[in-house]
Amino acid sequence: MALWERGAGGAAEAGEDATEEPERGLPLLPWDRFSAWLHCVCVVGFDLELGQAVEVIYPPHSKLTDKEKTNICYLSFPDSNSGCLGDTQFCFRFRRSSGRKASLCCFLDHLDRDLPVYLKKDPAYYYGYVYFRQVRDKSLKRGYFQKSLVLISKLPYIHLFRTVLKQIAPEYFEKSEAFLEAVCSDVDRWPPPVPGEVLHLPIMGVVMKLRIPTYRDKPGTTPVVQNMHQADAQISMTLPTVHEVDLFRCFCPVFFHIQMLWELVLLGEPLVVMAPSPAESSETVLALVSCISPLKYCSDFRPYFTIHDSEFKEYTTRTQAPPSVILGVTNPFFAKTLQHWPHIIRIGDMKLPGDVPKQVKVKKLKNLKTLDSKPGVYTSYKPYLDKDEEIVKQLQKGVQQKRPTEAQSAILRRYFLELTESFIIPLERYVASLMPLQKCISPWKSPPQLRHFSQDDFMKTLEKAGPQLTSGLKGDWIGLYRHFLKSPNFDGWFRSRQKEMTQNLEALHLEALCNENLVFWSQKHTEVETVDLVLKLKNKLLQADREHLPVKTDTLKKLQTHIRDIILALPDDLQDILLKTGTA
């Protein structure tokens, strides 16, 4: 079986030689490694007659629908009002066209399973990482050279791909297409994006060293990236993170309101970020989404959204309430189109955080007339929790003492993490109590069902085991929980926990079966009952593989041995039939 299916991401041509993935002994075809990291690389230019157009897609066999190409075209250029002269980097996210064949199979699914929930791929979306250049050029009719180099990927590794673009884009604009081919060939030599391993990624003479987090990592910690087999002299740069943004820089214009913003994101409230450029809008939206980590933000979010987006009508209609989505916009038109939205964040030009904004009060929505309105948060929302003055003082003190922005971001990240954990721990504790006891698991009965989630029962647990055990914040925690239980973020979190616990029950049931003397059981029962048992056990093995059940390898081997021993005790004609119906 190939390492992964060759579909939209990159199909090897017939007759091309396969290499082997040394650790797994699986065949690797050209562009398989590339497809693990990127879907494709696009160059978007400006044509006087056509407007924005995709000039190059690499590798050439990469598949994009016309709708996807149109979205990429408009999202890869700043709105004309942004006035982005020079080089600008930003990020966007867009829906994949429906009915597309998935390009990844079991191995990459396995990698995805080891990631923290907030880094798992969403198969319905692509990310676009943009390096846009606009410089004066009198030789061109328009008077400007305008072009974007865009990396399209399913992976939300913002910092990694931003770093890659910073390395390759300036040289690409000088050397053009042959250079792009060399870049893609380099990526096709990268190891798979295995969580938890130290990876060395060469790109045009530079070697990046990084580590992708795993779900086993303690939240809020970044394990030290240590050298494995590669000498220090060969490492050009070490990336401390693959996905994090500069939190403090993003929240600096509105940091008096960070706790309220955390509540709005947690509750999946409709939020729009109005910013002067795609760089500011995309970084702020990504910072908002990350502020409830390690919870996954389960609604849609668009770091940069334009009036040409295929979902423009869906998201701006006034015939229904605004959807649970976070939009980053720069076009002044949105100040009017989205003025019915309940929560609007206005971001000014992001400078290095040397000045603390003086504005403290939340502004009323009716005061937001245009995109030129003063920076601030425009909403009538009343937070459930009392304001934490300590974090504001701590950050203000950091500004006065000229504390590095990295340190300020670390303080802010730790604050958000502790707030989110204080909120989610009571829910985790209650949901864990819905799991049946191990003694209730019988090998001869179907695995027991999880108990039903009762909002009333959960609320009763908060009096003695609520967030007050880990947080000193006062306020209406009960009201916050009631609101959260109706949100898409709760729905996504609970579905994930349900799936995880159901798989644990299936795994425990499988272990219980393995601990039985199944051969002895078969000797006491009819041939029909024994054949039925064999088929059920084989289905259990298939389920364990298909659903990636958390079963030890020894348990699976033991079950295979049981199946084989039972079959060999049957008459020859039945042995032949059962041995042909799958591996025993």
From Swiss-Prot:
Which GO molecular function entries does the Swiss-Prot or TrEMBL record give?
A: guanyl-nucleotide exchange factor activity
Question: Which compartments does it reside in?
Answer: Recycling endosome; Cytoplasm
Question: A Pfam family matched by this chain, by name?
Answer: Avl9
Where the record annotates domain dDENN, the positions are 371-504
Q: What keywords does the record list, in alphabetical order?
A: Cytoplasm, Endosome, Guanine-nucleotide releasing factor
UniProt cross-references to InterPro entries, sorted A to Z = ABL9/DENND6_dom (IPR018307), DENND6 (IPR024224), Tripartite_DENN (IPR037516)
According to the entry, every stretch annotated as the uDENN domain falls at 39-218
Q: Which domain of life is it from?
A: Eukaryota
The record lists its disulfide bonds as none
Residues of the region (Disordered) are 1-23
Keyword Cytoplasm part of the UniProt annotation: yes
Q: Which residues form the cDENN domain?
A: 244-369
A cellular component term, taken from the record's GO annotations: recycling endosome
Task: State what this protein does.
Answer: Guanine nucleotide exchange factor (GEF) for RAB14.
Similarity comment: Belongs to the DENND6 family.
The molecule here is called: Protein DENND6A
Source organism: Gallus gallus
Q: Which gene encodes it?
A: DENND6A
